[in-house]
Amino acid sequence: DDLFNINAGIVKLFGVTTLDVVRTQDGGTEVVEAK
């Protein structure tokens, strides 16, 4: 879901989380540790 991905990016931007949500090749989403 695009909105979820955008929100996750915003949250990471403000340092609230150390997780990053990325799109997988099959169109799903995957939560990975931020580097």
Swiss-Prot record:
Binding residues for substrate: R23
Keyword Oxidoreductase: yes
GO molecular function: L-malate dehydrogenase (NAD+) activity
Top-level EC class: oxidoreductase
Keywords linked to the UniProt accession: Mitochondrion, NAD, Oxidoreductase, Tricarboxylic acid cycle
A GO-annotated cellular component: mitochondrial matrix
GO terms (BP aspect): tricarboxylic acid cycle
Residues that coordinate or bind NAD(+): N7
Keyword set includes Mitochondrion: yes
Main location as per UniProt: mitochondrion
Catalytic activity: (S)-malate + NAD(+) = oxaloacetate + NADH + H(+)
Record EC number: 1.1.1.37
Annotated localization: Mitochondrion matrix
Similarity comment: Belongs to the LDH/MDH superfamily. MDH type 1 family.
Assembly and oligomerization: Homodimer.
Name recorded for this polypeptide: Malate dehydrogenase, mitochondrial
Upper classification of the organism: Eukaryota, Viridiplantae, Streptophyta, Embryophyta, Tracheophyta
